[in-house]
Amino acid sequence: MDSEIAGRFREQDTSILPSSLAWVNVARIKLLAAVVFYVFALVYGHDKYLSLVQAFWGFNSPHFNLSNMLLIIVLAVIPAFVMPLYLTRPSSLFIYALVFCVYLPGVVTGMLNYEDSIDRYLGLFSCFCIGLVGCCLAVRCVPLRSNASRSFSRPLLLTCVLGSLTCFLVLFLTYKDILSFSGVDDIYAQREKGAATSLFIGYCQVYLAYFFSPVLFATGLISKRILIALLGFAGFIFVFMITAERTVLLLPFAMFLMAFIFKARGANPNAPVYLFVGGGVMVFLIAELFDQVGLFQELGFYFYTRLIACPGLFVTQYYDLFSTQGFTYWAHVSGISWFAEVPAAYAADEKWPALGKILAERVLGVQSQSNASFVATDGVAAAGGPGVLAIFMLYTVWLIALDWVSQGWNKVLLLTALFPLAFISTNGPFSTMLASFGGGLWIAMLWFDKFRMKLWGHRL
């Protein structure tokens, strides 16, 4: 049975663009149908919810015509022909997060927001589509192993435990006077109190919440080691008591759900279908019931608007701002900023290089942080469509490296632990994801734990 499943994996991974209808198997047809269903749900939600309730953020009344609807469908289904069918490698997790939260919502919102949307954004979304398709094809170069059962070594887990406890101690000594479970009314006051007082404190916050705690919680959950799982869970709660980030509080519950899905459906080609169908059904329910049921009103803001709609909207908002006031040409990226000149339009702006704050002030007229995906910040804002292609090249190289060092690991464990990072990839710059949220450390850690010499029976 295992060899049969492995054969299906290899067969699916080596398939390229279809040369005949025989290539389009049942699973691929289901995925295409699910993507189209999700797209129509987003169109319906834009018309019945976003443009009515969330217009402040930039969701305009939709402009329906045959040409933009056809273009939406074409841009949606092209990547679906090459997207992975199985959630069996880290790159699949990141690709689906990007498509679900950024690409498809961006295409729908961008094409509906203006009467001249096609003239405005056709080149931009064509580059986005090309970059995504190229990424889906390129990650297939890493072979998939069927004997993926390795768990994190004891020295690695000990390192994560020590790292977690160190962050606990440093953060407790820094914030012991303001620790609290903030309610809805005082959540922003708590965030102000819990703001990082230095670069080191900031790294302690994000690494505890997005690296050490996910590793420990996933390990404890999958291997049924209760104390390890509790330590990871405590890390999420502790950071929430400092920063009042709802995302951090919800991560362990989302990871628990993801672990169940990866274990039950990871080798099932219908798993991505459930993602798009489930997301589409949720959007339909929100659009129909947000003004009748309080639960759907909350889901409308936190699930639909914040998680799905805004990351997609930011692709076009960043393009509208930076294409007119000047692209950054990656001068906002740490390291490049040391020798690159700040564009004239932002040289006197005290918010530079925080592009999200610049956009919030200049487009929305508010003091906020419009966090966007790496496509918007490191691609669109940097150089428009060509910038998107450039950042996709780097992103694809990183995904290939991550898949390569992930060979042989327990896939359920690894995908569960990586889920928070996949979420961050839809809401943050690529450089921030690598340095501040552990994207680079993951590759180093897996390589170190996998290829170093053995001591005392464990890999070091």
Model-derived features with residue positions:
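Hydrophobic alpha-helical segments of polytopic membrane proteins
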Residues: 8-17, 124-133, 222-302, 398
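Membrane-anchoring hydrophobic segments
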Residues: 1-212, 216-217, 263-270, 284, ...
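Cytoplasmic juxtamembrane regions at transmembrane-helix boundaries
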Residues: 95-97, 107-111, 223-244, 342-352
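Hydrophobic alpha-helical transmembrane segments of integral membrane proteins
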Residues: 76-81, 106-128, 234-260, 357-365
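Short hydrophobic/aromatic segments of transmembrane alpha-helices and their interfaces
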Residues: 229-233, 369-371, 414
